[in-house]
Curated annotation (Swiss-Prot):
PANTHER family: 50S RIBOSOMAL PROTEIN L21 (PTHR21349), LARGE RIBOSOMAL SUBUNIT PROTEIN BL21M (PTHR21349:SF0). This is Large ribosomal subunit protein bL21. The gene is rplU. This protein binds to 23S rRNA in the presence of protein L20. GO terms for cellular component: cytoplasm; ribonucleoprotein complex; ribosome. Transmembrane segments: none annotated. InterPro entries: bL21-like, bL21-like_sf, Ribosomal_bL21, Ribosomal_bL21_CS. GO terms for molecular function: rRNA binding; structural constituent of ribosome.
Length: 103
């Protein structure tokens, strides 16, 4: 069984037992969270698509860790004007262990 969930402005296809990295969630490590924004639920050949959400469907997940992604380097330059700007960014994430999918 799998589900398509929405969290942090992004959509993820998840199945029971998977680990995924999502945008940072304000929850402690080891805490169990319930994601109720389920866009679709599938089981083999059967697919249930919500309009926009599947009513009554939830996905439970456990917070495994918090961290930062690799650094993304930004470099801006104007040719012949002696202008260079360097900047870096590390996006924070939360790693989730997907538990039960209830439709």
């Amino acid at each position: 069984m799998y589900a398509v969930i929405k969290t942090g402005g992004k959509q993820y296809r998840v199945a029971s037992g998977e680990k995924i990295k999502v945008e940072q969630i304000a929850a402690d490590v080891g805490q169990e969270i319930v994601i109720d924004q389920v866009l679709a639920v599938g089981n083999g050949a059967e697919l249930k698509v919500g309009t926009p959400l599947v009513s009554g469907a939830t996905v439970t997940a456990t917070v495994v860790a918090h961290g930062k992604h690799d650094k993304v380097r930004i470099f801006k330059m104007r040719r012949r004007k002696h202008y260079q700007k360097r900047q870096g960014h590390r996006q924070q994430f939360t790693e989730l262990q997907i538990g039960a999918i209830a439709a």
